[in-house]
Amino acid sequence: LNAGSGSGYSTWSPASADGRWMAERNRDLYAKIIVEANRIAVRNRRGAANFIVGTPKVCAILEMLPEFQWMQVSGNVNTQPVGIARVGNLGGRFNVYRDTRTEAQLATSGYDGDNARAAELNYVLLGYKGPEFYDTGLIYCPYIPVMVQRTIGPNDFSPRVGLLTRYGVVDNIFGADLYYHVIIVKNLGDAFTPGTTSVYFG
């Protein structure tokens, strides 16, 4: 988000979408995703966004699109029911992941007033991950269990052993902001005009 509006993040609202009914508004969000995905390709010169992380409501909107393909789960797989889970593929170009952790920050989820969010937050995080481990915005440098180094103590010449272990999560040297974009989705469940009961995705 530090990259700023238009580069690091943008907003989308169903009230301002170019659509007459729910399916057309869903397509408008999909069009916004494609535009921002291609802007990532222009910024990083590596490729367009190829994965999406979204809140449950945003994933529900994406799942209604005809381009969405469900991820097949075999019966013998031990699935993880919480956290971030892969839910499918959109248009053959985006792997879609659902983030259920964001919803846990709402006041209705058991948090007290000091730690609760004032309003529900919905978003679409677009990102690019290339074929190489370094071809991404954030790089996980893996944990090395133990490196052992033998040495001699300089004061008494007794044998010593040094142990070292480390890992790191670092930004790409050219900038992590070139690989990601957040679309903040506003006004889900709000009436388009005051005093009406008609809402989009309430």
Can you describe what each PLM-predicted range is?
Residues 1:
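P-loop NTPase motor catalytic core
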Residues 4, 11-39, 43-46, 50-51, ...:
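Sequence/fold signature of self-assembling virion shell proteins
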